[in-house]
């Protein structure tokens, strides 16, 4: 039943204090209050009144330039709204939130296929998820059209064809091979030089352009002019010390050996180890000591080279093959941006004799290495249709198709007519003289493009409490934590009733969250909660910031995910997102942050931070700090809005229409704070900016790339239209401000972090709502608030530790409710 508010009390209060900005003529923040229903019958209405209560409690409304309500008047309104919304929360929670039927997303599709076939699907084979905002697991926001169906059908066919091709191939013995990249490179250079020398000799002997094989006389003169730079440069390269034993990377005038590479044949079922031995060729800036390692077009790691000609450094990385990997190139290049070599060398202040910085001695490969157990597909195919002599083929085919379909449909029995249809397709193909493998392609592709595979189907109970079955709960837990269907161990626990036993459930969840598969929780949930998509999309001018190349961008994104993954595995407190004594970095980020790095390979490692380090937590990462910029300079406004939304659990209001751009309003050099103050003087901007701008200044010691600074350079730094000779000056950074919801001041990063930690209950709620939305595949509603209150209260008693929070979510009845809408 509805909860009815006091019309007389609230109408008078709103008319007196609110309608000027939130009434028929103006709706600041897209909010209108005079038409808000006093009958709270649903979550939307309750949520709107909750927002009113929140801003009144925080003292944000009415604004300072409007008449304030008396203490007694405000006290009565707050008490009435609080009591009414508490009743609404309880009544609405009894009906629960509805979960729309949801499709498995790209990440879940890849991991589900991996479980079925033991094959890794490359991203380029899958259609995009097309999620504008929110989590990619939320059914209401997912789109699926005939375009998606056609793409998934094509992808399924590719997967099945590769799986059938390799399913009965013998597993090869692992071998170690060594490639000397200079052999191919030097052979090419010698041939190139010989051809140039031969032509030049004939020209000197009086041969015409036609006799030499050159287009015309003009091209002949151009050939003579370029002879020394082209042939001479290659000759000089071949004469360099150790050029006959390895390859110098990125040498000027010789693009053919800018990379060290060779081709290898791969088994898509296997994992390989790649190694290379390298040395620093000459004294160059440290920024030029990093290599990028790729397999085909995929970058798989970054390495810092610190070896010498006498003692090279050896680097190794593992690579799990994709199903499209059959013959691919393994190559290493110097890690730098997209600038031309000449521009890049000029930017880094290169003064060495040669342009090359790194010498590669050799490239090595070891493998293939196979998983210990066969995939479901391999095991069941070899037991039925994959035998050397198949007895009773029809029976074996039906047995295989039924077992595969049931596994693909997550232990749900397929409809008899569906199995009959795929079985008849197999029979028809066999009658048309196709092999067993050829006959299986279309039937299995149909299974993998069926709604029962692409959508997570949960049956609604017909009687009693509306909870999912134990098997459905097992899959719900597994897709939540691992982005893949439940394995045999979890399904057996469900069958034994262990998921309803809190002690057994906790043991199961701890094991799952310590397993490597829990990486998908960082990859899927945390990257979306932290809004790392914004970091991916922000444009940084590489010519102005040469250190910020793809290597730093990719590494910084992974750092944020690795921090959360470490918190999950070690059951650390959520406050580690604010302040921690560690971070998780690779060698490239260690250089970027000026930190010591103990592990000399590209794999990420958890490192302890020095006592005085500004790093620590999500807010100390390049990913967070860079997406809190406008691409040219740090932005307290953007950082403040991100902090408010993620860490203080309050979504900033959208800007009013026609709001002016935050831009320089003076010809004089201005600090970021002065620019923001100019913006806040505008009446339409002040009320919102007063709430989150002060937060952003707490991180102002970090520049737009997340590097520490004590001073700010004033002027049109990085602007293309900046006037030459324009004066700039440097002033000390002032990282001070105030927390908007408590008026607690801070005057440096340490005090800012302490203040944010004191608001940890808001971060806990932000993460809790995010995890619940991600895990259930639906938006959080007002009806869910009582459950979230209970979850957060229990998590707080355990110091907001991540695994404890996840346990509280999964054991709560809200996580076990059945879907109610389709």
Region annotations inferred by a language model:
Residues 34:
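Short, aromatic/basic-rich helix-turn unit that serves as a nucleic-acid recognition element
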Residues 2-31, 44-60, 64-822:
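Low-complexity, glycine/serine/threonine/alanine-rich intrinsically disordered linker
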């Amino acid at each position: 039943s509805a909860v009815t508010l006091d019309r007389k009390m609230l109408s008078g209060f709103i008319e007196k204090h609110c309608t000027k900005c939130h009434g028929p003529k103006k709706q600041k923040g897209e909010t209108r209050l005079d038409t808000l229903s006093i009958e709270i019958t649903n979550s939307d209405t309750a949520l709107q009144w909750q927002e009113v209560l929140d801003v009144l409690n925080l003292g944000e409304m009415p604004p300072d330039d409007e008449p304030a309500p008396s203490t007694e008047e405000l006290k009565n309104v707050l008490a009435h709204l609080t009591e009414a919304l508490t009743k609404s929360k309880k009544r609405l929670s009894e009906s629960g939130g509805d979960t729309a039927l949801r499709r498995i997303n790209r990440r879940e599709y890849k991991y589900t296929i991996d479980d079925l076939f033991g094959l890794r699907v490359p991203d380029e084979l899958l259609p995009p998820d097309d999620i504008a905002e929110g989590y990619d697991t939320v059914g209401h926001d997912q789109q699926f059209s005939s375009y998606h169906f056609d793409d998934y059908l094509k992808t399924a066919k590719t997967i099945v064809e590769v799986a059938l091709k390799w399913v009965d191939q013998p597993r090869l013995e692992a071998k170690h091979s060594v490639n000397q990249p200079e052999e191919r490179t030097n052979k090419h250079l010698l041939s190139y030089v010989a051809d140039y020398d031969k032509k030049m000799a004939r020209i000197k002997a009086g041969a015409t352009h036609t006799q030499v094989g050159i287009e015309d006389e003009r091209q002949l003169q151009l050939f003579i002019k370029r002879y020394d730079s082209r042939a001479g440069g290659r000759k000089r390269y071949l004469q360099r010390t150790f050029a006959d034993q390895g390859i110098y990377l990125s040498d000027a005038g010789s693009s053919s050996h800018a990379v060290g590479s060779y081709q290898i044949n791969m088994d898509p079922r296997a994992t390989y180890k790649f190694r290379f031995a390298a040395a620093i060729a000459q004294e160059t800036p440290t920024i030029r000591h990093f290599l990028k390692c790729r397999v085909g077009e995929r970058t798989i790691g970054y390495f810092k080279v610190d070896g010498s000609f006498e003692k090279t450094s050896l680097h190794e990385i593992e690579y799990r093959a994709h199903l499209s990997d059959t013959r691919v190139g393994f190559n290493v290049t110097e890690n730098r941006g997209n600038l031309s070599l000449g521009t890049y060398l000029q930017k880094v202040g290169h003064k060495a004799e040669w342009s090359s910085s790194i010498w590669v001695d050799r490239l090595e490969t070891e493998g293939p290495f196979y998983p210990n157990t066969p995939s479901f597909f391999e095991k069941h195919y070899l037991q039925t249709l994959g035998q050397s002599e198949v007895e009773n083929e029809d029976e074996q085919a039906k047995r295989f198709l039924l077992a595969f379909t049931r596994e693909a449909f997550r232990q749900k029995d397929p409809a008899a007519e569906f199995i009959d249809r795929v079985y008849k397709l197999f029979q028809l193909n066999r009658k048309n003289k196709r092999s067993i493998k050829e006959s299986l392609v279309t039937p299995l592709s149909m299974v993998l493009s069926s709604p029962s595979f692409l959508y997570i189907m949960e049956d609604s109970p017909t009687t009693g409490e509306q909870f999912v079955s134990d098997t459905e709960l097992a899959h719900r837990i597994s897709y939540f934590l691992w982005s893949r269907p439940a394995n045999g161990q979890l399904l057996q626990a469900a069958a034994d009733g262990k998921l309803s036993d809190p002690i057994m459930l906790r043991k199961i969840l701890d094991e799952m969250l310590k397993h490597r598969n829990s990486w998908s929780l960082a990859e899927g949930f945390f990257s979306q909660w932290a809004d790392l998509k914004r970091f991916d999309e922000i444009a940084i001018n590489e010519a102005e910031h040469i250190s910020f190349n793809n290597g730093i961008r990719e590494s910084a994104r992974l750092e944020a995910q690795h921090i959360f993954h470490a918190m999950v595995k070690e059951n650390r407190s959520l406050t580690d997102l604010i302040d921690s004594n560690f971070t998780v970095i690779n060698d490239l980020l260690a250089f970027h942050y000026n930190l010591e790095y103990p592990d000399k390979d590209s794999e990420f490692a958890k490192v302890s931070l020095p006592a005085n380090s500004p790093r620590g937590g999500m807010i100390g990462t390049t990913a967070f700090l860079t997406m809190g910029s406008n691409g040219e300079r740090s932005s307290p406004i953007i950082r403040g809005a991100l902090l408010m939304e993620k860490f203080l659990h309050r979504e900033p209001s959208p800007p009013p229409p026609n709001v002016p751009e935050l831009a320089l309003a003076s010809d004089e050099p201005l600090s970021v704070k002065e620019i923001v103050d100019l913006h806040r003087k505008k009446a339409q901007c002040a009320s919102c900016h007063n709430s989150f701008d002060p937060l952003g200044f707490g991180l102002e010691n970090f520049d737009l790339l997340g590097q520490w600074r004590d001073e700010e350079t004033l002027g049109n730094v990085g602007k293309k239209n900046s006037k030459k000779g324009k004066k700039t000056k440097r002033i000390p950074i002032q990282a001070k401000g105030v927390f908007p919801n408590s008026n607690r001041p801070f005057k440096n990063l340490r005090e800012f972090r302490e203040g944010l930690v004191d608001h940890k209950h808001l971060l806990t709620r932000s993460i809790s709502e995010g995890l619940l939305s991600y895990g259930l595949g639906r938006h959080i509603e007002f009806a869910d608030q009582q459950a979230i209150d209970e979850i957060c209260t229990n998590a707080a008693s355990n110091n907001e530790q991540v695994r404890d929070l996840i346990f509280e979510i999964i054991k709560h009845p809200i996580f076990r409710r059945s879907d109610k809408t389709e």
